[in-house]
């Protein structure tokens, strides 16, 4: 069952769902709570590697990722991040989100931004039960013009769904969880995957 605005507000008041900073009441509507853009980004460096072999040896995968990912870029107050056409970048939400083990979150981009060519999440829009941390956004500009993105602008919306029972393996209890407590624009940790499974 997806939570309505009234239930989202109540879950926030009761501390079942934690969002920091706490959203204003007017950020909650229908079945979502608005989230804003944070100030940390990463970009892919052009021509630093001919390719990334995602199924190669872990050390080679990590080495390739280290070559293609920029250091984290932290914007000063009032500055904009420019995402150019055809460019992929990582960013974080301004808000940190903590979910209990019986609620899954769903991140959706804004229609107004999509109509300008901005994809807020390339594929990863599920926020697992037991998650705690900032959410990394995978931005892609499929439009024709560069887009200026500013910290604290409204970037997307989260909805929440109650599971039929608490998850047996919530994110915060998993040994293989790669992004626990992330607070920055964390690059892919695919090299940590167990390739034998």
From Swiss-Prot:
It comes from Alteromonas mediterranea (strain DSM 17117 / CIP 110805 / LMG 28347 / Deep ecotype). NCBIfam families: dCTP_deam. Keywords: Hydrolase, Nucleotide metabolism, Nucleotide-binding. It catalyses: dCTP + H2O + H(+) = dUTP + NH4(+). GO terms for molecular function: dCTP deaminase activity; nucleotide binding. Belongs to the dCTP deaminase family. GO terms for biological process: dUMP biosynthetic process; dUTP biosynthetic process; nucleobase-containing small molecule interconversion. The active site is at 138 (proton donor/acceptor). Homotrimer. SUPFAM superfamilies: dUTPase-like (SSF51283). Its EC number is 3.5.4.13. Pathway: Pyrimidine metabolism; dUMP biosynthesis; dUMP from dCTP (dUTP route): step 1/2. Pfam families: DCD. It is an enzyme of class 3 (hydrolase). PANTHER family: DCTP DEAMINASE. Catalyzes the deamination of dCTP to dUTP. The gene is dcd. This is dCTP deaminase. DCTP binds at residues 110-115, 128, 136-138, 171, 182.
């Amino acid at each position: 069952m997806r939570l309505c605005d009234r239930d989202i507000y109540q879950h926030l008041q009761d501390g079942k769902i934690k969002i920091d900073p706490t959203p204003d009441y007017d950020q909650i509507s229908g079945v979502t709570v608005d989230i804003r853009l944070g100030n940390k980004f990463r970009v892919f460096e052009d021509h630093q590697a001919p390719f990334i072999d995602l199924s190669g040896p872990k050390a080679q995968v990590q080495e390739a990722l280290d070559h293609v990912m920029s250091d984290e870029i932290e914007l000063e107050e009032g500055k904009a991040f420019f995402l150019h056409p055809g460019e992929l970048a990582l960013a974080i939400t301004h808000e940190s989100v903590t979910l209990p083990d019986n609620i899954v979150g769903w991140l959706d981009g804004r229609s107004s931004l999509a109509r300008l060519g901005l994809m807020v999440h390339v594929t990863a829009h599920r926020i697992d039960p037991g998650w705690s941390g900032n959410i990394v956004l995978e931005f892609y500009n499929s439009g024709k013009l560069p887009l200026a993105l500013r910290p604290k602008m409204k970037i997307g919306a989260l909805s929440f769904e109650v599971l039929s029972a608490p998850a047996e393996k919530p994110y915060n209890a998993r040994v293989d969880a790669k992004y626990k407590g992330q607070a920055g624009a964390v690059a892919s940790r695919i090299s940590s995957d167990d390739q034998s499974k």
